[in-house]
Design a protein with these regions (language model features):
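Hydrophobic, aromatic-enriched alpha-helical segments typical of multi-pass transmembrane helices
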Residues: 2-177
């Protein structure tokens, strides 16, 4: 009788990156649901949805980095650290740091990290350009929504466009790994 041994895959190998791709797809689908603002009337359910999205985003960002780590160098690594750390701020408790909420500190850190990762990916053609455009457009929509509230009410165009980017990222990670 022979025993089959389990294959152990370390992070950065193909199955793990594909696994992270599924989390990117889940984050994208849940983000679109959040963007449609159908559950905003139930604050507990809305909070649970955003926690699930943020946790999925952590895996999605990790998978994205592992997918392109050999192509983007130290600048790409810095972008990953910023995006991952900023998402941790957003997903974590709403503590105040230097008078600011963790969420308000996390958003610009995530944005800077994702823009850096996108710029590196674009230069090295590591991810399809339309995905990177979705991230850039979502940042522009987020900034404009401070001045044009109709971009956020009754639906969040930022969430929808941002989430479409993660759907595409997830599809790419799954397809290529």
């Amino acid at each position: 009788m022979s025993m089959k041994t389990a294959t152990i895959h370390r992070p950065g190998t193909l199955p793990f990156v594909r696994f992270c791709g599924y989390f990117a797809v889940i984050a994208g689908l849940l983000g679109i649901l959040a963007g449609l603002r159908l559950i905003d009337k139930n604050p507990n359910l809305a909070e649970l949805l955003y926690v699930a999205i943020d946790l999925c985003l952590l895996f999605a960002i990790l998978g994205w980095h592992l997918h392109q780590q050999n192509k983007v160098g130290s600048v790409g690594l810095a972008g990953f650290f910023l995006a991952f750390t900023g998402t941790g701020f957003i997903a974590g408790p709403s503590a105040k740091i230097f008078g600011f909420t963790a969420y308000s500190l996390g958003i610009p850190v995530v944005a800077l990290g994702l823009l850096t990762m996108s710029w590196c990916a674009l230069r090295r053609r590591a991810i399809p350009g339309w995905i990177l455009s979705a991230f850039g457009l979502s940042l522009a929509i987020m900034i404009l929504s401070f001045y044009l509230p109709w971009l956020y009410q009754p639906i969040s165009f930022f969430n929808i466009v941002f989430s479409i980017g993660f759907l595409g990222l997830g599809y790419t990670l799954i397809k290529e790994h």
